[in-house]
Swiss-Prot record:
<dbReference type="GO" id="GO:0004386">
    <property type="term" value="F:helicase activity"/>
</dbReference>
<dbReference type="InterPro" id="IPR024779">
    <property type="entry name" value="2OGFeDO_JBP1/TET_oxygenase_dom"/>
</dbReference>
<dbReference type="GO" id="GO:0007131">
    <property type="term" value="P:reciprocal meiotic recombination"/>
</dbReference>
<dbReference type="Pfam" id="PF00176">
    <property type="entry name" value="SNF2-rel_dom"/>
</dbReference>
<dbReference type="GO" id="GO:0005634">
    <property type="term" value="C:nucleus"/>
</dbReference>
<dbReference type="GO" id="GO:0005524">
    <property type="term" value="F:ATP binding"/>
</dbReference>
<feature type="binding site">
    <location>
        <begin position="568"/>
        <end position="575"/>
    </location>
    <ligand>
        <name>ATP</name>
    </ligand>
</feature>
<feature type="domain" description="Helicase ATP-binding">
    <location>
        <begin position="555"/>
        <end position="730"/>
    </location>
</feature>
<protein>
    <recommendedName>
        <fullName>Bifunctional helicase and thymine dioxygenase JBP2</fullName>
        <ecNumber>3.6.4.12</ecNumber>
        <ecNumber>1.14.11.6</ecNumber>
    </recommendedName>
</protein>
<feature type="binding site">
    <location>
        <position position="415"/>
    </location>
    <ligand>
        <name>Fe cation</name>
    </ligand>
</feature>
<dbReference type="GO" id="GO:0046872">
    <property type="term" value="F:metal ion binding"/>
</dbReference>
<dbReference type="GO" id="GO:0050341">
    <property type="term" value="F:thymine dioxygenase activity"/>
</dbReference>
<dbReference type="GO" id="GO:0003677">
    <property type="term" value="F:DNA binding"/>
</dbReference>
<feature type="region of interest" description="DNA Helicase">
    <location>
        <begin position="541"/>
        <end position="1098"/>
    </location>
</feature>
<dbReference type="InterPro" id="IPR027417">
    <property type="entry name" value="P-loop_NTPase"/>
</dbReference>
<feature type="binding site">
    <location>
        <position position="417"/>
    </location>
    <ligand>
        <name>Fe cation</name>
    </ligand>
</feature>
<dbReference type="InterPro" id="IPR049730">
    <property type="entry name" value="SNF2/RAD54-like_C"/>
</dbReference>
Length: 1098
């Protein structure tokens, strides 16, 4: 092993020298020679191994190991180390051995490391500390002695920190600036300057022919910077539009006023509070903090210094006249705001005043820091949740505040503040003025808080509040107050995608003119305040903007040890988002384990996605997936993992993809299993009350919990509350379950048709949306082709009507029939299906084996058919055997409509999926279509994963295979059938999200055609299912789509057959409406657009 600086004779071979440097961590000096090679040979081989090269001593070159840290990490470490005392330095050196070094693992590759990367980092820190503090006389000789001063970024970091230590200002425009711009790249101007400087530097290096240092390996391999991201994922800046539109948007509605006439409060009926106190919204269970009063909380001189720069922000250019008696008050917004409803190029950005006065606003930092400290001390859980939620780039002076509202001489009428983070509190303080009165009164508490200069009030801004009267208003009075808070709109998917596009643009500018360097790229690398997010470079261009935004949202929460819910509509690629997250986590912590919990039918989908994207660099050496069967391969993988846990082999990170049923057994086998990250697919299952799965998961010590679900809200709003509470336990401490249920009840009351509940529903809806934004990434929209979704109300044949009357299919009777399992859906499918079902057995029309009709000994069942029923069943079988198919089909309205839809799709040379919940219906459909010579394939819930995979492949590749018949509740999950652009829901389930999952098998990413959905509704059981569905859809829209919605009344639904815009469909509807069933009733009674079954309120 080499010691210190080793001279290598010219007879040594270059390969052996580089092997020694790479494995031992020592440095070596080489000279060009026939046996070593020329400069080009030395530099190219050094670069290939990711080693570093410095142009000293004179005539020779020094080879150094790869630096095992990223540039920004090294800069931060050197900053802390050079300013630390000796004890703190020793602590830092010790801590170096406790962290991961993914760059080191990659650079060593197949070599066996004979040193710890912490040793090398420690040497760099020690040298940097010496350089920063060295006398001027000692600095110049170091240039010829230390190779560290010849390689980036060490040389730039050392010179930069020395300038700071000496009090010398760093000129960013100086071409000799010691710190590379990429270390502090944040603004567009910085990025553009970097690109120009880098191009100039390369030109100079080429012309000089010197080699002070070989270029570091690039951030990625085989991908040009221009091809790194897909079109639409990078910010496009239109300077002309920005100049004309940015300053038109300083106005935004920030208050919710609840009446047309402003209501002003007086002290009458309010208790004046003058002493420090904390208030709750109720006594006993379910209470929550709503106000904390701190008189004299901030020194007056701190307040007045901040007032000098904040007061000019308060102008009459605002939309707050309704809370000021009809006249615009003097008020303004400082910091960041979400201009979601304005025609701006940037929806989330600095306010106009902030953009023009950032330099002056530094004088308000002591005030903000003081308020932030009070907040963390007196409402620690609210403060913690707000710190978790706030995006780092929107933090004002490192606090949990993104925004400040400045009010001057403004006595507000009663209002609530819109868009504030509801798991946090607003922080109000008076910072200047001479006045009497004008207390802040909160109606619900019946308290008025005296606020003089320096007094502070933390309070729930969703409660109605306003100022009391000013004493002696005829005397000139002055009062300036500020409210500091977090705007939840800054965490919307719109803002997340906008921010992601901006970061992508900076990354491209940062990588401009660089050489190929690595197979991964840190797509958060343009902003050092963000946690790293590593993505395979060949994969990045396949990630849609919404997927990149979701990844950014997740890693910001995991960095703060919080989980989150990813609520992306089906088909937007949640699985790829999750796998990319796993890649980044394992890149940073290669020995960590990750647990992915998913329903059994979807496990193969995860494996397929892993294999598919592995071709684009998404590699996982230890990806263990099983449905719980003790297969040989799975057992071998578990044994290998066991050996690593027992230290028999080096520990490597594993990803386990398992189903909930196997989880308990897995945890029994691997006690003290502690995953770094836990992902729950179709995570709405976690929200069920008394869920054993949740109990098992809660036993795992893992704070980083990610829930994936396109349908996080299935039946009621409390499910969303339990989901968010599961990913972040602190939520229930600031919003108790009882309070959330009250909000949910307000929404439910309106959804179910009580128009008088509209006002309360809107308030509750806004509160829940503002509460969940910090923990739920929502993207319910998509850029897919059009979706045409229809409700087809099918008629009944005379035989069906006869049995309907016999069964008494009223709504009351429907409930009774459900209890005894006489399912009217069999009758709506076909009389033959119904008669076979009640006889307790029928011959499967696909496989030829007898099915016991899902029999259950605990269920009463008619065991014998009446004679007429037996004759009819035999007659129906004869119709099929004699190929009198039209007569057989015309016995059912739904079957007649279905067959005509299938024949239309076949004539158009397109493909169709038919979903049904019931085996009897699936069999009957399959046999009927097969008899009609329509090529059909059926996939049921009991079918193996291999059969499903073959069905997918066959359906995609075989142009003759027109129809797939699938089980709705099982086969709908985890399958991709985008070859079809027509979907029939032959029957519907009480939970509309089950149907939504089914539709998403065809209506998802990679679908290139418009998709038409046909929901077949009979006059028997389905109308009650529909009523349940529309209520839940209205609730879903209220909470996740931010649209106040309710069920449509029967007389509000309009038959769209006659006014259908598509001529071919209009003709088709008309044909079905004139088609007669047995008994002369119409096959199709009405056609409605499904989206109109739920009405949105303005």
């Amino acid at each position: 092993m080499l010691n210190g600086l080793t001279r290598v004779s010219t007879s040594s071979e270059l390969e052996s020298i580089l092997d020694i440097v790479q494995s031992s961590g020592e440095i070596a000096v080489v000279f060009t020679s026939p046996s070593i090679g020329d400069l080009e040979t030395i530099t190219s081989e050094t670069q290939r191994r990711q080693l570093r090269i410095a142009g000293i001593p004179r005539g020779g070159y020094t080879i150094l190991p790869a630096i095992p840290l990223y540039d920004d990490e090294l800069l931060q470490m050197c900053e802390r180390y050079t300013s630390a005392n000796e004890y703190e330095k020793a602590e830092m050196r010790n801590s170096l051995y406790m962290r991961e070094y993914p760059l080191f693992t990659y650079s060593i590759r197949h070599q066996r490391a004979l040193f710890h990367p912490a040793d090398y980092v420690s040497r760099i820190l020690q040298f940097c500390s010496y350089y920063v503090q060295a006398p001027d006389a000692d600095v110049l000789p170091l240039q010829d002695k230390s190779p560290f001063l010849h390689i980036s970024p060490i040389k730039e970091i050392c010179k930069h920190l020395r300038l700071i230590a000496r009090g010398t200002p760093v000129a960013p425009d100086d071409s000799e600036s010691p710190v590379p711009e990429q270390l502090r790249l944040h603004a567009e101007s910085d990025a553009e300057k970097l690109a120009a400087e880098r191009a100039t530097a390369m030109s100079i290096a080429t012309s000089s022919g010197g080699a002070s240092e070989t270029e570091q390996p690039s951030l990625f391999s085989g991908v040009a910077p221009s091809a790194l991201f897909q079109k639409g994922a990078v910010e496009e800046v239109d300077k002309d539009a920005e100049d004309t539109m940015e300053d038109l948007t300083g106005e935004e509605t920030v208050d919710a006023v609840h009446s047309f006439q402003a209501e002003y409060l007086t002290l009458d009926g309010f208790e004046l509070v003058t002493k420090a106190s904390i208030y709750y919204d109720r006594e006993g269970e379910g209470q929550r903090v709503v106000a904390v009063y701190i008189p004299g909380g901030v020194p007056e001189d701190t307040c007045r210094a901040a007032a000098a720069v904040l007061e000019p922000a308060a102008t009459k250019k605002n939309l707050r006249a309704p809370t000021n008696g009809g006249l615009p008050p003097d008020t303004g917004i400082v910091g960041y705001y979400d201009y979601l409803t304005n025609p701006t190029q940037h929806k989330c950005r600095e306010t106009e005043y902030s953009r023009r006065n950032w330099g002056l606003l530094a004088q308000s930092e002591p005030l903000l820091k003081h308020l932030d400290k009070l907040y963390s001390q007196l409402a620690p859980m609210h403060h913690h949740l707000q710190r978790v939620a706030i995006p780092s780039q929107y933090q004002l002076c490192g606090t949990v505040f993104s925004t400040i509202t400045v009010n001057r001489n403004f006595r507000t009428a009663v209002h609530t503040d819109k868009g504030d983070f509801r798991s946090g509190l607003g922080v109000l303080s008076v910072i200047n003025g001479e006045f009497e009165g004008c207390h802040l009164a909160i109606k619900r508490l019946k308290k008025a808080f005296q606020l003089k200069v320096g007094d502070v009030l933390l309070f729930d801004t969703s409660l109605e509040h306003g100022n009391t009267e000013v004493v002696n208003p005829e005397i000139h009075w002055q009062r300036t107050s500020v409210v500091c808070y977090l705007r939840t709109g800054l965490m919307s998917s719109v803002c997340e995608m906008e921010r992601r596009k901006h970061l992508n643009r900076l990354i491209l500018l940062q990588l401009l003119n660089t050489e190929v360097r690595n197979t991964t790229v840190n797509i958060n690398g343009a902003d050092s305040s963000l946690p790293p997010l590593f993505v395979p470079t060949r994969l990045a261009s396949h990630l849609a903007p919404v997927q990149l935004a979701a990844l950014g949202f997740i890693v910001e929460r995991t960095e703060k040890q919080s989980g989150c819910v990813v609520a992306m509509t089906m088909g937007l690629g949640k699985t790829l988002v999750a796998l990319t997250l796993c890649f980044s986590q394992l890149h940073l912590a290669p020995q960590a384990d990750i647990l992915i919990l998913t329903p059994k039918p979807i496990i193969s989908h995860w494996v397929d996605e892993k294999n598919k994207w592995g071709m684009h660099g998404l590699h996982f050496p230890h990806f263990v997936a099983s449905d719980g069967l003790n297969s040989l391969e799975f057992e071998q993988q578990l044994l290998e993992y066991e050996r690593q846990r027992n230290n028999e082999k080096p520990k490597l990170g594993h990803i386990f993809v398992i189903n909930g049923e196997y989880l308990a057994g897995f945890l029994r086998r691997f006690k003290r299993f502690t995953p770094l990250l836990m992902i729950v697919d179709e995570g709405h299952r976690v929200a069920a009350k008394g869920n054993k799965l949740t109990e098992s998961l809660d036993r795992l010590r893992c704070n980083l919990r990610i829930v994936l679900s396109g349908t996080p809200l299935q039946n009621d709003a409390s499910e969303l509350y339990r989901l968010v509470g599961w990913v972040n336990k602190g939520v229930s401490r600031v919003l108790p379950p009882k309070r959330f249920q009250e909000l949910a009840n307000d929404i439910n009351q309106f959804v179910e048709g009580d128009d008088g509940a509209f006002y309360n529903a809107v308030m509750a809806q806004e509160y829940i949306q503002d509460w969940m934004r910090g923990f739920v990434f929502r993207e319910m929209e998509n850029d897919l082709p059009p979706l045409h979704d229809y409700l087809l109300i099918c008629g009944s044949s005379d035989v069906q009507r006869e049995y309907e009357e016999k069964l008494g299919l009223t709504e009351t009777a429907m409930t009774a029939l459900k209890a005894t399992e006489h399912r009217p859906h069999h009758l709506s499918t076909h009389p033959a299906c119904y008669l076979a079902f009640i006889s307790d057995s029928y011959q499967s029309m696909v496989s030829g084996w007898t099915v016991r009709a899902q029999s259950n000994t605990s269920r009463p069942r008619v065991s014998q058919l009446e004679e007429i029923d037996t004759m009819r069943l035999e007659q129906y079988v004869q119709l099929v055997e004699n190929e009198q198919l039209d007569a057989f089909i015309d016995l059912s309205g739904k079957m007649r409509v279905l067959v005509d839809i299938v024949l239309r799709v076949q004539a158009r040379k397109e493909k169709l999926i038919i979903f049904s919940l019931y085996v009897g219906s699936q069999d009957l459909i399959h046999r009927t279509l097969t008899a009609l010579r329509v090529c059909t394939f059926t996939v049921r819930g009991r079918d193996s994963q291999d059969r499903r995979r073959r069905a997918m492949q066959e359906f995609s590749e075989n142009k003759d295979l027109i129809v797939l018949v699938l089980s709705t509740k099982i086969a709908a999950y985890g399958l991709d059938f985008t070859a079809a652009n027509h979907v029939v829901l032959f029957d519907s389930w009480w939970n509309p999200q089950v149907d939504a999952q089914a539709i998403a098998r065809a209506y998802r990413r990679n679908q290139r055609k418009p998709v038409t959905v046909y929901r077949l509704i009979s006059a028997t059981e389905n109308k009650f299912v529909l009523r349940s569905q529309t209520r839940k859809i209205a609730l879903f829209k209220c909470i996740l789509h931010e649209r106040t919605s309710r069920q449509a009344l029967p007389d509000e639904l309009e038959d769209c057959a006659a006014n259908e815009k598509d001529e071919e469909r209009r003709i088709f509807w008309a044909k079905l409406k004139t088609t007669s069933l047995a008994g002369d009733s119409r096959a199709l009674l009405n056609v409605y657009r499904y989206q109109e079954s739920v009405r949105e309120s303005e």
